[in-house]
Curated annotation (Swiss-Prot):
Any one GO BP annotation for this protein: 'de novo' UMP biosynthetic process
Main localization (coarse): membrane
Topology in membrane: Peripheral membrane protein
HAMAP family on file: DHO_dh_type2
Organism the protein comes from: Thermus thermophilus (strain ATCC BAA-163 / DSM 7039 / HB27)
InterPro entries assigned: Aldolase_TIM (IPR013785), DHO_dehydrogenase (IPR050074), Dihydroorotate_DH_1_2 (IPR012135), Dihydroorotate_DH_2 (IPR005719), Dihydroorotate_DH_cat (IPR005720), Dihydroorotate_DH_CS (IPR001295)
Pfam families: DHO_dh
Protein known as: Dihydroorotate dehydrogenase (quinone)
Binding site for substrate: 66, 111-115, 175, 180, 240-241
């Protein structure tokens, strides 16, 4: 099946796979029986972050299941949490196709999707149905602004989306770093970000995080850290996709959009280490270029409380979460670490 999907156009393959997973998600016993074989349930993997308990630190990054259609499948496949979105207050179709590209030689993807989604209200209905099933999957909700909303009114979009979705998320992420919505990254700059956080922080008592770009300078990252602390956010998600293209082999490397996967690995780790130096109690969620148990272990040791995957899962297939978590347990045993909680206390 995995090989068949790779023979299709990338966006068509994503749509087909997501449709099948959404169907499977609603099948009750057909979901729960395979979950017993796929999930790695081990108390050593449990994580506490921003007041939420996670069965393991490996999560599905935003972008895979924007509209919260296949949440049961992510639980059954072994993820410790899933982040839906990016969701905007109004539905939007996103950028013209083609807009998703596989760079197989680089184990990477380029996307310029443009926040295509069915809107916050529809996603809220899906999230409500999932919550009623009682499956123990912590959920993050990634929020963005509509393309046609001017920057000076961006906060209103985030607030509108949050009002629909606030009852159903365990934590919320403000996406101000996608390279595929014109002008959006300006919201990472001091004055815009200061105003945005000042308006969003009082809107929910639930954990609020900020997603940052890998292309920020150390000085800009420090400014983001300072504002995150000033407005009492609970953490940062680092990093989004990059505009950089160094060292790529694929003929598709010049396509416009955000690059994810293996080429992002080094920069994602650099940003994580920089943020960890000044985090001072903030939870850090690392994403970008995670492909192996060693990658996962490295992020946790560098200061991440949680780690997300997207492109690695696309290339690694449905057993990818299980392989990473079993490998993580072996690495913990080899280094004499009895629990991830112990690693955090150290």
């Amino acid at each position: 099946m995995h090989r068949f999907l790779f023979a299709l156009d990338p966006e068509a393959a994503h749509g087909l796979a997501l449709g099948l997973l959404a169907f499977w998600s609603e099948r009750g016993p057909l979901l729960e029986v395979p979950a017993r074989l796929l999930r790695v349930e081990d108390p050593r993997l449990r994580v506490e972050a921003f007041g939420v308990s996670f069965p393991n630190p490996l999560g599905l990054a935003a972008g895979m299941d924007k509209d919260a259609r296949a949440l049961g499948a992510w639980w059954a496949l072994g993820f410790g949490f899933a982040e839906v979105g990016t969701l905007t207050p109004r539905p939007q179709v996103g950028n013209p196709k083609p807009r998703l590209f596989r760079l197989v030689e680089d184990r990477a993807l380029i996307n310029r999707m443009g926040f295509n989604n069915r809107g916050a209200e529809e996603a809220a209905r899906c999230l409500k149905r999932f919550r009623q099933r009682g499956l123990p999957l912590p959920l993050g909700v990634n929020l963005g602004k509509n393309r046609d909303t001017p920057l000076e009114r961006a906060a209103e979009d985030y607030l509108k989306a949050l009002r629909f979705l606030e009852p159903f998320g365990d934590y919320f992420v403000l996406n101000v770093s996608s390279p595929n919505t014109p002008g959006l990254r300006a919201l990472q700059e001091g004055p815009f970000l200061d105003e945005l956080l000042a308006r969003l922080r009082p809107a929910t008592p639930k954990p609020l995080l900020l997603k940052v770009a890998p292309d920020l300078s150390p000085k800009a990252l420090d400014e983001v850290l300072a504002l995150t602390k000033k407005h009492r956010l609970q953490g940062l998600v680092a990093v989004n996709t990059t505009l950089a293209r160094e060292g790529l082999k694929s003929p598709l490397a010049r396509e416009a959009g955000g690059l994810s996967g293996r080429p992002l690995k080094r920069r994602a780790l650099e940003v994580l280490r920089h943020l960890a130096e000044g985090a001072e109690g903030l939870a850090l969620v690392s994403v970008g270029g995670v492909e192996t148990p060693l990658d996962l272990w490295e992020r946790l040791k560098a200061g991440a409380s949680l780690v997300q995957v997207y492109t690695g899962f696309v290339y690694g297939g449905p057993l990818f979460p299980r392989r990473l978590l079993l490998g993580l347990l072996r690495l913990m045993e080899a280094e004499g670490v009895s629990s991830l909680g112990e690693l955090r206390r150290a």
